[in-house]
Regions:
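A penicillin-recognizing enzyme superfamily signal
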Residues: 133, 141, 145, 149-218
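Sec-dependent N-terminal signal peptides
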Residues: 3-13
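Short pre-catalytic segments that frame enzyme active sites
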Residues: 19-82, 93-95, 114
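Glycine-rich, acidic and aromatic/proline-enriched surface loops and short helix-turn segments
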Residues: 48-62, 91-96, 107-108, 137-140, ...
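Extracytoplasmic
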Residues: 39-41, 71, 77, 81-82, ...
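Active-site SXXK
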Residues: 30, 34, 51, 74-102, ...
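Conserved catalytic neighborhood of penicillin-recognizing serine enzymes
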Residues: 96-150, 171
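Beta-strand segments within the central parallel beta-sheet cores of soluble alpha/beta enzyme folds
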Residues: 46, 100-107, 180, 184
């Protein structure tokens, strides 16, 4: 199985004093993570609050070399990491609410002839959950059943496009949605870390918000 790691970070402060410090830290962290999870390749992009990419690294453990710069702008399937891009317009129109419930059953669902599986399908799935919980626990079935009646869920973006989207959420850019929707999304991203699939990153010392994502390649 080909395993890839994609990590996009937005920092409002950093202890690294120089660009070289940031680059070294980013590459070292990526290499360590790839080895820990036995992944084939991965990339990291680090953006500051002003929207500047202050560090990035892409590595392949298959040959130990950095990937080409095009990897940051190449469109690919971003999986559930891209779900909020489709979610926001649907929330804005009032088609759905984060408190709406959806039955994901055993975590296996046939959508347009394709089998969709949640990461915990082998353990029986989540059953009935809210749309917000589908985001927190990275339930593909919950998201598709909730949103597909109202929109086409696009998941193909470049890492740079996705990073810019999450930066807009981090800095409360109301050009992409209303203040109400922005607050709901930000609170949900905080809960991903405090209660959901991002819980391993939770810290009592600093507030962290974000979204985990996954994609299965046949």
């Amino acid at each position: 199985m080909n395993i890839q790691i994609l990590l996009l970070l937005i920092l409002f402060s950093t202890f690294a004093s120089t660009k070289s410090d940031v680059s070294f830290t980013v590459e070292t962290s990526l290499r360590t993570t790839l080895q820990e999870v036995n992944a084939d390749s991965g990339l990291v992009m680090l953006m500051d609050s002003a929207g500047n990419v202050i560090g990035k690294s892409s590595l392949s453990l298959l040959n130990g070399k950095s990937l080409e710069d095009e990897v940051y702008t190449t469109v690919r399937d971003m999986g559930t990491l891209a779900v909020p891009v489709s979610l926001i317009p649907v929330l804005e129109k009032g088609n759905v609410s984060l408190s709406d419930t959806v039955d994901v059953g055993n975590g296996i669902y046939n959508h347009n002839g394709k089998e969709i599986r949640d990461h915990n399908a082998d353990m029986g799935g989540y059953g009935e959950i809210t749309l917000q919980q589908a985001i927190l626990f990275d339930s593909k079935v919950g998201v598709i059943k909730s949103l597909s009646p109202y929109t086409t869920i696009k998941t193909t973006y470049s890492p740079t496009e996705i990073l810019n989207f999450y930066h807009s959420i981090a800095v409360s850019d109301h050009s992409i949605c209303s203040a109400k929707t922005m607050k709901e999304i930000q609170q949900t991203f905080e809960m991903v870390v405090s209660e959901g699939t991002g819980k391993p990153l939770f810290s009592d010392n600093v507030k962290i918000a974000g979204k985990t994502g996954s994609v299965i390649k046949e």
